[in-house]
């Protein structure tokens, strides 16, 4: 029977150096919380049991774990460390959440090392089981030129094997000079770990139960202790404050961008491009400077994104072009063009080969294939059919002060500039509207809708009502000009109406 693996993720710390109301492990980078990064990596080991130890703000962190259960599609047990009494105590809490008869490998990792990946955890487990007699403990180590803050790996002089891990606060001057340090990631034999945890004591500078003391206990009992040395130290770098978090975010992004370039994506300026780990890109995508692709955004093959574009949870079809656009929770069809300066709000669906042009804002809008909204338009709560064109400066008036209503525009519709669609209203297939039309009623298919009366001019209105202004002086200098004659009553009616 294959040896089973259980993973215990430590997420109980307060993270006071973050100086935040948000628990440290719930701070984000690359579109995921540090906790999510750790649990994703743990899930790649395909453990029989996955446990997260929570403590500080346990309700909030526990809720985040619950959400990740759904995301990962596997159960995650939450163990509570009520009193923060060191890493040894935290692991004891996690171990108590495992079945009492569990006899496999216990992998222990931390929730604040977001670059640690499943490949590294697999390698640690393989090293732990590599000998005919499996190790009691296998420690992941790395070399740190500046080892401040890390536990030092003390090796035996005669064979170079690990003798103990000494925490910095307890290290002698000679031990403090050691540059091989503890990464805080371990593989344990479950039976040995249960026994060793019962032998821990708090006789140290911190007055806590150190998990690292388990190594010394193993050595004293003659149990095998292995080490797996990691050359890529960034994978186990922690984030204790926001400065460290920002550095890790930049490093994670650098790796993500480079991975996509190696996979066939052109990134013109990697230094100004940010791509979350949940993003998916097709081959031959081109990303111009100043682009942020966030959340679960997907971009199809041959699409061109940017410059200066932010897309969050947006699906972009093959061959589409998106320029200087801000979009979220939207769909852009294959071959469509968006921008510059477009704003796609949640619920926007742009069909294949459609167009949203300069200074167009959309929300809850379904715009059919080959339809165009070229410029200066708001489309909210609307359905537009195929091959339609919405004139410049049009507004879909979707809110009456109490509730929102929907506008439906058919296919092959042409609307003039400055058309107002006062919802709820429907425009039939093939209909036209004149410029400046206010649509308050449905338009039948093939009809031309025009609102407003005949233009009428009131001669001399500016000179009479705005005397002394530059406009009045300019009008007087232009000389007398008379519009078509109006009945005196009409003139007075117009004069009164405008002056009101």
UniProtKB/Swiss-Prot annotation:
UDP-N-acetyl-alpha-D-glucosamine binds at residues 10-13, 24, 81, 86-87, 151, 167, 182, 240, 345, 363, 378, 389. It comes from the Bacteria. It catalyses: alpha-D-glucosamine 1-phosphate + acetyl-CoA = N-acetyl-alpha-D-glucosamine 1-phosphate + CoA + H(+); N-acetyl-alpha-D-glucosamine 1-phosphate + UTP + H(+) = UDP-N-acetyl-alpha-D-glucosamine + diphosphate. Residues 1-242 are annotated as: Pyrophosphorylase. Acetyl-CoA binds at residues 392, 398-399, 417, 435. Binds 1 Mg(2+) ion per subunit. The active site is at 375 (proton acceptor). Its EC number is 2.7.7.23, 2.3.1.157. The keyword Metal-binding applies. Keywords: Acyltransferase, Cell shape, Cell wall biogenesis/degradation, Cytoplasm, Magnesium, Metal-binding, Multifunctional enzyme, Nucleotidyltransferase, Peptidoglycan synthesis, Repeat, Transferase. Residues 243-263 are annotated as: Linker. Residues 264-500 are annotated as: N-acetyltransferase. The keyword Repeat applies. Gene3D superfamilies: Hexapeptide repeat proteins (2.160.10.10), Spore Coat Polysaccharide Biosynthesis Protein SpsA, Chain A (3.90.550.10). Catalyzes the last two sequential reactions in the de novo biosynthetic pathway for UDP-N-acetylglucosamine (UDP-GlcNAc). The C-terminal domain catalyzes the transfer of acetyl group from acetyl coenzyme A to glucosamine-1-phosphate (GlcN-1-P) to produce N-acetylglucosamine-1-phosphate (GlcNAc-1-P), which is converted into UDP-GlcNAc by the transfer of uridine 5-monophosphate (from uridine 5-triphosphate), a reaction catalyzed by the N-terminal domain. In the N-terminal section; belongs to the N-acetylglucosamine-1-phosphate uridyltransferase family. In the C-terminal section; belongs to the transferase hexapeptide repeat family. This is Bifunctional protein GlmU. It comes from Rhodococcus opacus (strain B4). The lineage of its organism: Bacteria, Bacillati, Actinomycetota, Actinomycetes, Mycobacteriales.
């Amino acid at each position: 029977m294959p040896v089973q693996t259980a993973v215990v993720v430590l997420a109980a710390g307060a993270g006071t150096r973050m100086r935040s109301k948000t628990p440290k492990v719930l701070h984000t980078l690359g579109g995921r919380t540090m906790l999510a990064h750790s649990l994703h990596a743990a899930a790649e080991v395909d453990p029989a049991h996955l446990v997260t130890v929570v403590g500080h703000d346990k309700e909030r962190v526990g809720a985040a774990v619950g959400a990740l259960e759904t995301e990962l599609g596997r159960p995650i047990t939450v163990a509570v460390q009520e009193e923060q009494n060191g890493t040894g105590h935290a692991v004891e809490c996690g171990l108590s959440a495992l079945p009492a008869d569990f006899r496999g490998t216990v992998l222990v990792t931390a929730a604040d090392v977001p670059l640690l990946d499943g490949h590294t955890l697999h390698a640690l487990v393989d090293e732990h089981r590599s000998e005919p007699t499996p190790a009691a403990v296998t420690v992941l180590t790395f070399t740190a030129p500046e080892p401040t803050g890390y536990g030092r790996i003390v090796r035996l002089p005669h064979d170079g094997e690990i003798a103990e891990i000494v925490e910095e606060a307890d290290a002698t001057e000679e031990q403090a000079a050691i540059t091989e340090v503890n990464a805080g990631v371990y593989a344990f034999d479950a039976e040995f770990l249960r026994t060793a945890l019962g032998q821990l004591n708090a006789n140290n500078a911190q007055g806590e139960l150190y998990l690292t003391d388990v190594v010394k206990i193993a050595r004293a009992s003659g149990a095998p202790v292995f080490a797996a040395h990691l050359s890529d130290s960034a994978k186990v770098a922690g984030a204790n404050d926001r400065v460290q978090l920002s550095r890790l975010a930049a490093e994670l992004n650098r790796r993500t961008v480079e991975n996509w370039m190696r996979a066939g994506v052109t990134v013109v300026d990697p230094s100004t491009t940010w791509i979350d780990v949940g993003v998916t890109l097709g081959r031959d995508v081109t990303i111009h400077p100043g682009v942020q692709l966030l959340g679960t955004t997907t971009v199809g093959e041959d699409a061109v994104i940017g410059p200066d574009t932010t897309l969050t949870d947006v699906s972009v079809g093959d061959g589409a072009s998106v320029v200087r656009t801000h979009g979220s929770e939207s769909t852009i069809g294959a071959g469509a063009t968006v921008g510059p300066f477009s704003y796609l709000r949640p619920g926007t669906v742009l069909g294949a080969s459609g167009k949203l042009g300069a200074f167009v804002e959309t929300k809850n809008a379904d715009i059919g294939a080959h339809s165009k909204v070229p410029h200066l338009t708001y489309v909210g709560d609307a359905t537009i059919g195929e091959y339609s064109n919405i004139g410049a400066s049009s507004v879909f008036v979707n809110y009456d002060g109490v509730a929102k209503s929907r506008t439906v525009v058919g296919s092959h519709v042409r609307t003039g500039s400055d058309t107002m669609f006062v919802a709820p209203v429907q425009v039939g297939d093939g209909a036209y509207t004149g410029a400046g039309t206010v649509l308050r009623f449905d338009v039948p298919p093939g009809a031309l809708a025009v609102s407003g009366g005949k233009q009428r001019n009131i001669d001399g209105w500016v000179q009479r009502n705005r005397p002394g202004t530059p406009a009045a002086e300019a009008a007087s200098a232009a000389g007398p000009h008379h519009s078509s004659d109006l009945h005196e009553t009409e003139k007075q009616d117009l004069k009164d109406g405008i002056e009101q």
